[in-house]
Amino acid sequence: MGPPLKLFKNQKYQELKQECMKDGRLFCDPTFLPENDSLFFNRLLPGKVVWKRPQDISDDPHLIVGNISNHQLIQGRLGNKAMISAFSCLAVQESHWTKAIPNHKDQEWDPRKPEKYAGIFHFRFWHFGEWTEVVIDDLLPTINGDLVFSFSTSMNEFWNALLEKAYAKLLGCYEALDGLTITDIIMDFTGTLAEIIDMQKGRYTDLVEEKYKLFGELYKTFTKGGLICCSIESPSQEEQEVETDWGLLKGYTYTMTDIRKLRLGERLVEVFSTEKLYMVRLRNPLGRQEWSGPWSEISEEWQQLTVTDRKNLGLVMSDDGEFWMSLEDFCHNFHKLNVCRNVNNPVFGRKELESVVGCWTVDDDPLMNRSGGCYNNRDTFLQNPQYIFTVPEDGHKVIMSLQQKDLRTYRRMGRPDNYIIGFELFKVEMNRRFRLHHLYIQERAGTSTYIDTRTVFLSKYLKKGSYVLVPTMFQHGRTSEFLLRIFSEVPVQLRELTLDMPKMSCWNLARGYPKVVTQITVHSAEGLEKKYANETVNPYLIIKCGKEEVRSPVQKNTVHAIFDTQAIFYRRTTDIPIIIQVWNSRKFCDQFLGQVTLDADPSDCRDLKSLYLRKKGGPTAKVKQGHISFKVISSDDLTEL
């Protein structure tokens, strides 16, 4: 079974089609009429618009002619480049376009059974976390007999024009498509999770290791059904569509249609002086202005390969506008990468994606308010929603995506297109269960851009530990819904922090409700004991308070370990001490290296401290070798930390 399907406007395709066939009429959609209101609400029409059905435009109309990627698409006099680029990208992976265009063969014109055609189509979009089916009629806007928006160079092919109409209906009108980024569109067509990579900031041309690391990620994404496109930014409007020295167009988005790591045979190793080639195949959606540099069809490299060589290596091209280029040239020529990962197919590990729908809401009570504005609003920032997740091991890449509810359907009522949104990421105590109230010791682990786009992204390699993500609008006191998605190679257990402190219950009242909250950060343990010179010491921490404990990651082969491990405890009394122990991880039996015992009273100094390790037995036990540096903050206000 597929994912749950939401019916837009509650229209049921099969029922509507059966009614039309029974009545012998073509469908006319009452919820998206062939009127100017379905086109624009601000722009002026460049001429008289006549809505025509495909059979009035072509003698032999088809939804798809041959292979969906065989024909080039034109944006039309009122269309936009982002839409054409997204169509081109969508056509690369059959698993994606067949999801957006369900049962495409059943929706096709059948000249042998014209009575089965009812002028009705249905398409599916991933809309704010839900797969949504949109039903439309086949009336398309034309001026002087020509389609106003996108059309195919095969003049009897209509899949893109009909898909575009369904998308316009979903967002309110055709004008609502203006300003959408290719990332927005691809996500809506496929449900993929996007990451935008700045090729220049990544230094992929300078750092060889980073370049091959990028290739590995792109290869994995593509072979798992992801979509990848790239572009060359133009510094000004005048340079849009200007050709580079190597034949590429600025301002246009190229789609990756293949990626290969090739091992060369002995003869080709001598020719190219390398054993491996890292290659990508790209396509220009316009079907022209191909790459003219190395590995292009006119290049010396290409001519040195026989037809058999190309076939054996897989260096083939099936469409006009397709070309091969090396990884090095790819990194050197393109500025921005849109990497859209396929996270909806269980075969590829659906557990890798975790998502939650939330909202920014306003309340006069600071503990109830959930619209605190960006990080600049220090007094209210932590009044935003907060989400915690845990990275189980060092070095995992985590991609975070925050999407606001699309406001385009409200533009005709004077509402803004989008709010400025972003998010902050903090490394927090490993045992945190309640909301953050002040940022005393938390490390700021990352921040997204703040911009008025529909979606903002952040990609980070994170250390093992717990993290709190705070989604925000730039201004405080605004309300809106949002969708937060996190993608990682391992489950991260994303969940919202809703409580400010432990709940009052019969159980904790009987045991004693907490009166003090204590936050501790252990920075380092230095000068640790070695029994003999060549002994390997692999230290780790155990921070205890009563029956609760927090364990740090193991540091390998060092007597001067940097931990920066955080813990937080809600204590019934300061008579319950906090104990920080240092252990040596060994194969059979771990070795105790020493501990410190703290009262952690609210009146204690909050500055960084350093204490010698001692044997077990309290603060007066015998001193051992080594010392730890730490910071402790205690408060009798349970909502301070």
UniProtKB/Swiss-Prot annotation:
Protein's name according to its UniProt entry: Calpain-6
An annotated GO BP: proteolysis
GO MF annotations in UniProt: calcium-dependent cysteine-type endopeptidase activity; microtubule binding
Species this protein is from: Mus musculus
Domain spans labelled Calpain catalytic: 26-343
Record domain C2: where: 498-621
Taxonomy, superkingdom: Eukaryota
Ranges for region Domain III: 344-495
